[in-house]
Amino acid sequence: MSRTYYYMRISTAEERGKQKFTRQEKSIQDYCKNQNIEYDEHDVFKDDCSGKTFDRPSWKSLKSRLQAGDTVVFKDISRFTRVDTKEAYEAYMDLMKQGIRLVFIDNPIVSTDYIQELVGTAKKSNIITETAMESTVKLLLIVELNRVEEERKNISKRIKDGIAASEKKTGECRKGK
């Protein structure tokens, strides 16, 4: 029997200190309500670490349980990963080929159901060749995965720039009020 799992990830000190997983939980619970899916806390996996690697404890635990027909729901694709685009694409395609459905609430055009629907429509109507469709799908995924990778780099740069700007010339941190 197929199961639906929910994956959440936070990585910044601000997220840890303030909102935690609240925003993602609400989004996923709303999705479940709208889709008439039972939300079960036992099917929720949470990581409190960077998405720049797939070496995350809860992700590895979830991945080891996945079987063909299962679904993993994420708030958005950046919660899946922020690794380099090639590695992210390969991980996505590997899961899809295993029959795992990936749902990205805020990025529905890269959810596996939509991707498979695109391919199916193209095949049925003979609009474009299968090879061209595969290239189109690859491009669509790569654009979105590259966006989240670049977003990670920008966040990292802003954090480093902020730290550098807050330090005195002696290298000491300024004291807040």
Regions found by a protein language model. Give the residues of each.
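Acidic, metal-coordinating catalytic cores used for nucleic-acid/nucleotide bond scission
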Residues: T12-K20, K46-W59, D76-Y89, P108-Y114
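Anion (oxyanion) recognition and catalysis
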Residues: K33, L66, M96-K97
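Short beta-strand elements in bilobed, periplasmic/extracellular small-molecule ligand-binding domains
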Residues: Q29-C49
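Short, surface-exposed alpha-helical segments at coil->helix boundaries
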Residues: F21-Q29
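Short beta-strand segments enriched in small/hydrophobic residues
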Residues: S2-R16
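Phosphate/pyrophosphate-binding and catalytic-coupling "lid/hinge/switch" segments at subdomain interfaces
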Residues: E14-E15, M93-K177
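Short, structured active-site "lid" loops
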Residues: K60-D76
